[in-house]
């Protein structure tokens, strides 16, 4: 059986690398687009540099994306920004809509069958401007007629690493009535390995059953033991990149760090 080729934007980031590892474990061929940076791509990717194809490209620069979509069945777009800085021109619209538009055009021009957008679930602790930009990005992909899947993901964390008490409480409330009945399961932070494995399995489905997926859908694509124990294939964040709770898609341009 032919291995499906999947392109991921955001190589060298917490989310991008977790998705790459999950897809490799499922038998896919993976290509990573790594944003130009002072740190060499090989160093940012670690062992993934030898297990994937990778190229340097900037999703905010359409010219750098030219030709990278060819030969791929699916493209997963992971990059955006949860923290805006309008003084530097880094609005929610620029960070999330412009990057999505550029990747969508790469997919159309390169013959990519389907684009998966890592979007965000609405939650009280998530900025409304960020959510609005994500929804506009979702609508743009649909508007241009590109087959797409939307992952409205919560915040993620690496198992075994400290998290603020607030986020631990939010994860616990996911299964406690009445919070479990009012959509909390969609918003509660989840382990990165569960999210990555769920997205990988959706990406490899020939005919996804729905257009928009939330955290409960991702959990259902993990076995009981995977949900309980996690998996060793997910690369743990380095000391330099580790955060108690991770923004789902932050990889802002111009060397800017939120």
What are these regions (language model features)?
Residues 5-26:
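N-terminal Rossmann NAD(P)H-binding glycine-rich loop of SDR-like oxidoreductase domains
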């Amino acid at each position: 059986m032919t291995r499906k080729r999947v392109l991921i934007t955001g190589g060298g980031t917490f989310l991008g690398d977790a998705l790459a590892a999950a897809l490799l474990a499922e038998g896919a061929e993976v290509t990573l687009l790594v944003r130009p940076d002072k740190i060499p791509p090989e160093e940012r990717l670690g062992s993934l540099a030898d297990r994937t194809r990778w190229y340097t490209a900037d999703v905010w620069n359409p010219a750098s994306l030219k030709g990278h979509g060819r030969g791929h069945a699916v493209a997963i777009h992971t990059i955006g920004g949860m923290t805006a800085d309008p003084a530097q021109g880094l609005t929610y619209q620029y960070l999330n809509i412009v990057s999505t538009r550029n990747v969508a055009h790469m997919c159309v021009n390169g013959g990519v069958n389907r684009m998966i957008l890592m979007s965000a679930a609405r939650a009280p602790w998530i900025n409304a401007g960020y959510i609005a930009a994500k929804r506009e990005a979702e609508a743009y992909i649909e508007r241009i007629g590109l087959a797409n899947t939307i992952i409205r993901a919560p915040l993620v964390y690496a198992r075994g690493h400290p998290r603020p008490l607030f986020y631990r409480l939010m994860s616990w409330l996911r299964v406690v009535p009445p919070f479990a009945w009012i959509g909390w399961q969609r918003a509660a932070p989840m382990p990165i390995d569960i999210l990555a494995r769920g997205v990988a399995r959706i990406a490899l489905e020939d005919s996804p059953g729905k257009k928009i997926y939330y955290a409960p859908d991702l959990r259902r694509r993990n076995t009981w033991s995977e949900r309980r124990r996690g998996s060793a294939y997910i690369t743990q964040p380095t000391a330099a990149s580790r955060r108690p709770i991770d923004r789902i898609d932050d990889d802002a341009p111009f060397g800017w760090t939120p």
